[in-house]
Amino acid sequence: MAVLNQLPVLGMIKEFRRSWRALCSSERTTLCGPDSMLLALQLSMAENNKQHRGEFTVCLSDVLLTWKYFLHEKLNLPIENMKVVEHYEDIKKTYDDFLKNSNTLDLIDVYKKCSSLTSNYENNMISPIQLRDFLSGTEYAVSDEANPHMPESPVKCSQNDEQVRVLVKKIFFSYLSLLVNSKNDLALASILNIPDRGLGREAFTNLKHAAREKQLSMFLMATSFIRTLELGGKGYAPSPSDPLWAHVKGLSEFINFIDKLDEILGKIPNPSLAGSRILSAIKMQLIKGHSSGEPFYKAVEEVVQDLNLRIKNIINSQEGVAVSANNISPVPPKSFAINHDTAYCGRDAVKILLVLLDEDAASAPTRNKAELLYNDESTVPHSGPSVLTLFRSPTQEKNTSVKPLRERIHKSLQTEKNKMWQTLIRSQFACTYKDDCIMSKNKWHVNSSSKPLSALHLEDDVSEGAQSSVGKARIEASSENAHVGRWKGDKLPRKSTQRQISKGKQLDLDSENLHCDRGNELYQHKNIKIPKVPSGSHSKAGGKLAQGTKGNRCPARGKLIPGQTKLTQFFML
């Protein structure tokens, strides 16, 4: 639907392009239409909320309220009785910085720059109120009241087809905008993963962080990374810890495709043919993997035909203006102007694309603001996540040493779960395993019964030589047919590596004995007396202790681990 003030806006943009040298620093500066302005304001508000509240988000009501105040304040219109959100000045500064870094201007900036020109333009200038009505979309209401409502179509698929067509049109203009202005991050966000290149939200976030660190646009950062890999060699390769390594394939495909479009733009001098080739290349990239009967495929075909026709109309209108200018041939370029910034191959094609993009910037704003700002992937296929979702980092900054409470609780529960699962996996000799529940209780509830444990542990350390001899005697008693000279009186088996058990394990085994047999064995451990052995008489002490084990089995049995007697009787059968 055509808006009443669309033609004055187009006239303002044309005047800006004619005097671009005096108004901006680059010929390739692109313009933000109403929708792009609203998206940039939403991102600025979300960034401000992240700085003050810690969350990169903003509700729709706050965006619309700020949008209304923003239009009046920037156009110097009265703002009485109008609400404004907190930190508005910070939001406005973030908005201006975003446009400046993207090499873009909004329509209000264009209006202010054009108002500083000669008085010849002031006669045809659009008024601030008209520009406000155009940007806010109030002209829709006037048009709807003047015309009766059209009956809605009973076919629901027609509405979905229209949404797909609007999406495809946005994709084409984003590709063309990025081709003309490589600093436009808003355009890159719309096409980075369309078609699917495996560059989802994580890849976009990594690219955004890398671009901010080096103070580059996202497209230039991706180009620098890929060029370094292709041309730099091993000495100039990025760091192995660079997160962009995980997205090399997708970034390479994207950069190579933009290079292909740029090559078409520079090699073909005819702007009409160059524009047609560029649109055809984008079309082949989008319809890959789609059948001709799908709505997306049909929408791509329709948009390409429409854009080709518009390019031809732009060229014809420019040629007609040049011929009708009093039949005077244009002034030949001066020598100093031949190589002045914009003298490059394909400049005519770039001018045509700029006019096409300016017409899109002067198009009517989207009526459904919620769909524009918070689009749903499930309702419109191939749309991808919203711009706000893309610019929101999926992971938190790793600048804190303390992990979040939720992560710590989850890790603790996972450890307990693994511990319980390990206790279930037991062999047929389950009696030889320690009880984890008892061990955990003994670990946290230390009482007076812990004293015998330390006493036993100290006694074990003091009588290390004696215990080694006792161990040898028990090993000899466990196997009668191995060697000559073994003891035959004691048949209790014990491994030769018994003394190599760590002190921690010995403490756990003793504590378990004390826990299981509180009535009798606890006092047996207290009454165990191990004779003191001189350091130089190991053999004698060993013989005496060996005899002691033959005569009295109760103290020796008190040092066995739980279940060892059952295991010994099992092997004796």
From Swiss-Prot:
Gene3D superfamilies: PCRA, domain 4 (1.10.486.10). Residues 470-505, 531-560 are annotated as: Disordered. One of its GO terms (biological process) is DNA repair. Keywords: Cytoplasm, DNA damage, DNA repair, DNA-binding, Nucleus. Its main location: cytoplasm. It comes from the Eukaryota. GO terms for cellular component: chromatin; cytoplasm; nucleus. InterPro entries: P-loop_NTPase, PARPBP. One of its GO terms (molecular function) is DNA binding. PANTHER family: PCNA-INTERACTING PARTNER (PTHR32121:SF0). Required to suppress inappropriate homologous recombination, thereby playing a central role DNA repair and in the maintenance of genomic stability. Antagonizes homologous recombination by interfering with the formation of the RAD51-DNA homologous recombination structure. Binds single-strand DNA and poly(A) homopolymers. Positively regulate the poly(ADP-ribosyl)ation activity of PARP1; however such function may be indirect. Belongs to the PARI family. This is PCNA-interacting partner. The lineage of its organism: Eukaryota, Metazoa, Chordata, Craniata, Vertebrata.
